[in-house]
Amino acid sequence: MPCGDTVNIYISGSMAYDRIMDFPGKLSDHILPDKIHILNVCFTVNGMVEKFGGTAGNIAYTLSLLNERPVVIATIGKDYETYFDWLKKNNILTEGIKIIREEFTAGAYIITDKADNQITGFNPGAMKYPSGYMFHDADSKNSISLIAPGNLQDMVEYARICKEKGMDYICDPGQSLTQWEGKTLREWLDGSLLLISNDYELELIMKMTDMDKKGLLGLTRTIITTLGEKGSLISNSEFDVTIPA
């Protein structure tokens, strides 16, 4: 990718509404361990906050704060209008978002108590469907695609298209790892610009692919590993660099 040129950024992943509810007590006070086989509990909450979430939505918003204008590639449900208004307000392109009119947008329903314990229900909704973006107008030499957790069919297909077009792409498997098979994961990583994961996910990737870190660096050019309060580690075939938190 030429230095100094404007780079077109494509972010594929999920779009979701996060509906967060606050429970004033402790959830555990209302669950009887010896009666768990007939669990039937209602928690009355103090209120609900709705936030715009999903991997693609969150990453695109962060990039917009850096004055970038990424294209979001994802599916969204029939309740899309509020999310679209928010994306447009934040200068985020919606041309790559496919509306699934028979489904609701993916949604997380989260109850958090005063001890920060959580119970979450997640409806994948529109995320069950591939977005089917074809990158027809993408300038492969001045574009980059970040493939974040979302519809698995999309994740596999977008890596294939990027390779076919000669476009750099970044792999961020995250919470999608439980859906992958080792062979498919190796093929997905092969030819990528970057692999981004935390240290636990990296160990899982090495186990699933039956490869060590050196082997993975034969598939992807660079590995970025987040280490929580210890910062991040950037690795390629020549060096490791630690970035403080």
Q: Which ranges hold each PLM region?
A:
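A short, aliphatic-rich alpha-helical micro-motif
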Residues: 138-140, 189, 217
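A glycine-rich beta-to-alpha transition motif near the start of alpha/beta enzyme domains, typified by
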Residues: 69-96
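Hydrophobic anchor at the start of a short beta-strand
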Residues: 9, 68-71, 94, 169, ...
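Conserved phosphate-binding/catalytic loop of the ribokinase/pfkB sugar-kinase fold
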Residues: 95-100, 108-149, 153
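Conserved phosphate-binding/catalytic region of the ribokinase-like
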Residues: 9, 210-245
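Cofactor-binding loop segments of dinucleotide-utilizing enzymes, especially the Rossmann-like FAD-
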Residues: 14, 74-78, 99, 114, ...
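Conserved beta-alpha-beta core of the PfkB/ribokinase-like small-molecule kinase fold
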Residues: 144-213, 230-232
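Glycine-rich phosphate/adenosyl-contacting loop at the front of the ribokinase-like
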Residues: 2-71, 82, 244
